[in-house]
Amino acid sequence: MVVFLGRHLPALLEVFKKGSAKAESDNRQGAGPSQGPGSVGDELQDNVFFPSGRPPHLEELHTQAQEGLRSLQHQERQKLSKGGWDHGDTQSIQSSQTGPDEDTISIYSQKSYMTESSTAEDALSVRSEMIQRRGSTFRPHDSFPKSGKSGRRRRERRSTVLGLPQHVQKELGLRNNREAPGTPQPPGSRDAVRIPTVDGRPGLALGTGVRVSLQALEAETEAGTDAEAVIQRHIDRVYHDDTLVGRSTGARPPPLTRPMSLAVPGLTGGAGSPEPLSPAMSISPQATYLSKLIPHAVLPPTVDVVALGRSSLRTLSRCSLLSASPASVRSLGRFSSASSPRPRSRNASSSSDNWSHSQSSETIVSDGSTLSSKGGSEGQPEGSVASNNVAPPPPGGSGRGSPSGGSTAETSDTASIRSSGQLSGRSVSLRKMKRPPPPPRRTYSLHQRGSAVPDGPLGLPPKPERKQQPQLPRPPTAGGSSGVGAVSCPPSSAGTWGSGLSPGGSRRPPRSPERTLSPSSGYSSQSGTPTLPPKGLAVAPASPGKAQPPKPDRVTSLRSPGASVSSSLTSLCSSSSDPTPLDRSGPQMSTPLSDRFVIPPHPKVPAPFSPPPSKSKSSNQAAPVLAAPAVAPGQVSTIDTSPASPSMPQTTLTPAQESPVASKDESPPPSPPPSYHPPPPPTKKPEVLEEAPPPPEAAVEILPDPSWPPPPPPAPEEQDLSMADFPPPEEVFFNAGPELGPLESCSSEAAVPPAASLSQTPPPAPPPSSGSEPLARLPQKDSVGKHSGAPREDSGTPLVTPSLLQMVRLRSVGASTGIPNPSPGSSAPQKPLRRALSGRASPVTAPSSGLHAAVRLKASSLAASESPASALPTGIPEAEPRSPQSPASKASFIFSKGTKKLQLERPVSPEAQADLQRNLVAELRSISEHRPPPQAQKKPSKAPPPVARKPSVGVPPPSPSLPRTESLTAPSTNGLPHAEDRTNGELAENGGVQLAATEKMGSPGSDPQKKLV
């Protein structure tokens, strides 16, 4: 029946077509007259499955489908009735086992079967061909093509089986029954597809073959030969003639001449060793890629061959990379680091290995990227230095800037590593990623590294340091360099850094300047754009003890924590911990330990008189945090100024950090804050005036700023103060201290050293400063206490905060304008912090930073000169000292832009500043309560750097003090009304705090600040 239909299909189809056409024509004729145009719609509506209503194309489809079904059924019946296929399968299977001719046999059997099948299914095949020729959309499964396909498939399968690797056959006991074991046949000798053994020799009983067999190597190694030497010899032997690698077809080259594949190094060449010797599995890095033999491939120097023995695991060969590309070094480092403890002989390995010491090979990967971005030499020095000591990295100083890829890049890596803890170095891409994250991460890494000043940048030094002393260095970086980041966490870290950091700090400063640019990584630039200035600024801050200031350059972005290096960092730190801002303004996070140690090295001449112990006291709180010794003095006066302002902005941060401060300062500060807090908004301006005296102090200090070198002596004071050695002033300090403490707790690590510098610088001013500062401090402490004790109250100071915030921003924009104004005092302290924190933010330090630095220096100098004359200037001098720390100062400006600040900054006339400062002093004395305004100012400080704001918790603390300092200075310079003066005073008092406050409360002063900008 099927055959009949198949043979007569064409006629049948024609009949169907004719019938359907007739039916359709009749249908149309019948419906046409009545339905007219609607006939087409009716046709479409017809039941397609009703035979009479089907259009011809549908009919054809149905016919084809039926044919396909019939052909399938026919096939099934044939299979059941005939043994042809089964017979063929059996034959082919048998042949596959029979021998070399199996393929031919199977082909024959299939061919014979196909002929039968084709004759039997001739009709079907013809019919299916016909249908296909017609190009129908439906092609029935025609049995012939199907059978052919299946046959082909089986053949292919058989061929694959024929190719079973000989070692597999041996293991399965399928050893060639068909061929004598000793007589290998050339691959082309038979039709069957044979997969030649990888090494190109016949699969004899040698135990060689596809299996990666390092028997020869093992034998030699066991014999006592140096594994490395053996491997090298073997590789040389294998690759002496790479041209033959590809010749697997045709006459096979003599086994000895044909080089072995990398994956299967012809280590089996000496194959005689008994099977047990061969490793259960041996893995080589290239094995993955060696599925095919690559004609001219050479074993890369970085490849390690590891043999997993049945009983042991050992690295058979480790290539030494004497000269390898960064990538290869990277991979090599990875393998070497992971595989073997002993360092690679390659040169690059020095840096890679250093990394690898503390980190896994992954670090090496990062290192590889570092090498490429860093340039091997720089990355290496950094790595080596880091390895040797965090301190040594000075060579990386420039490298740091550029090492953003390497050291700096590593810093990114480091930052990321630091962030992840001691993660292995991340790759360059990560580094890139890191920079944007830096603000937050910076805060994090800074906090982490608060103690590790050396890593001025977030993780820059740390990475090497991490290698060397991953954990200690890192905290130090946070504390000393990244005071900001460290601020919150770093107290302990910072302490550690003190010892470990000092080297890092010193090394950091050198790089900091350059780094500043690189560090900005966007953030640093943001903070002051003093990327470049940071260097100069860093120099001035460094003198006070700001090894960090130099760091700022790189740190600026990474290290912004330290010197408000990056406004974002400031933001982060400040949001992270209010105390940080204080520290920043006073200590200029960067300076903490770094400053301490590095200040002497490259002290910026402008080291005003270190603030009196009062600063120290402020610093006391900070000192406990991390770099109390260095930071305390500066921080006390600067922070005092800064804290008050910052305390409010930092309320969020301060509370947590303030607790520490409070514990240090005790509840006194908290209580005072409430009393003062109520007046914050109104008092803010009065407070500014009130605090103006502290700003003069700052100014005095700042004036000496040029002689930052003097700060070293103050540092002791600062330490004492930090140590809370000044119980008498403690009350005042406690008031301001709580804020200071909180700020310093976060920022103390990073900022305390800067503060110390400031305090050291302003020693002359201390007396007046002490007198006024205590008052200012009280307000500050109130502010701080409010922050810590009554942060909410400080929050109440939002008025100041918004303006201060805006002011801070304006300041950052108009750092130059702000610098002169800040010089009166409030600005100066903040500026120093900022400068220290961000090398680029050293606008206050005219020498180091660009216009901002120059303006700020001018302002600070003016303020300093006035300050020395009167206590009022003292506050400014303090600010000014920060100015010298222009990195921080600039950051301070940026962050502590306060409306008041702006206004003050605008009137840069020294006289106006002096008057304002005097007013501020008077107000501070009379209105020490009005610390809340300082807090508000502190918030404005935070606000300036948008990025900083993001991390407002973490960044503002470090930056706020600087911003405050700047704010204070700016107000004095601007000669704004008492409101501005107050802002300045607050800034001076609150220093770091003011940053946060200014940022937060910058709204009032935002306009002025903007104008400045």
From Swiss-Prot:
Residues 336-361, 484-493, 515-530, 564-577, 615-633, 859-873 have a biased composition (Low complexity). It holds the Pfam family NHS. InterPro entries: NHS-like. The modification Asymmetric dimethylarginine is found at R318. The modification Phosphothreonine is found at T160, T529, T591. Keywords: Methylation, Phosphoprotein. Residues 600-614, 668-683, 706-716, 942-961 have a biased composition (Pro residues). Disulfide bonds: none annotated. It comes from the Eukaryota. Residues 20-195, 330-1013 are annotated as: Disordered. The modification Phosphoserine is found at residues 92, 136, 143, 159, 213, 320, 325, 328, 336-337, 339-340, 398, 402, 407, 543, 610, 667, 671, 838, 842, 848, 909, 952, 959. Able to directly activate the TNF-NFkappaB signaling pathway. This is NHS-like protein 3. It comes from Mus musculus.
